[in-house]
Amino acid sequence: GPTGADEASPWVRPPQFDGVMRDGGVLVLRGGAGPNARVVLRAPDTAAVATTADGAGRFELRLPPLSGDVRFTPEVQVGEDAAVSPETLVVIQGGAGPVALIAAGQPTVRLDGAEGLDAVDSDGATLMASGRTNGAAPSVNINGADMAPMAIGRGRWRAVIGRAGPATITVNGKSFDYPGMGAAGGFVVERVGAGWRITWPVEPSGRQTTWLPD
């Protein structure tokens, strides 16, 4: 079996969230981490939220009542080792709005999403639509051009087009009017069109926008 030295190896992996549910007024996040790992969410001006995964690595995190838009940094602690996730968990309007994981250069993971279009990400040069599927490849059309969506694991797909700006995105026959990037500097959450837009800075001097349709 593994020795103590093996268990203290650097392969402590960040938590992977795979869903959110509402239990009364409380948001409950579900996911996986290492067996018996301590999963922690840290946020500015908010007490850290923590739980311990079970022997299979599954965990449920119950968030306290939140107000406004809250950004959490997920991490895992195993013994003396900690792994901070490259993703930021964003809870919009205290959970009344979307719950999503954002990361520079990556398609946004919508924890509260359904089948269809979950998110549209842009860095000003390209536009990336993504969502989840029940197994069949979705039909995706951007500005009249049929796309070939790519499976990216965890039951999700993405389609990338080499241009940015407002667009009409149609997924399985349902159309969405993507409003384009936000102009804001810093971290901004705003209601735009029939959805929410998050704009945040990415290194070294760029920014990324994700739009989360209703």
Question: For the regions a protein language model found, what residue spans apply to each?
Answer:
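Ser/Thr-rich low-complexity repeats and stalk/linker segments
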Residues: 1-214
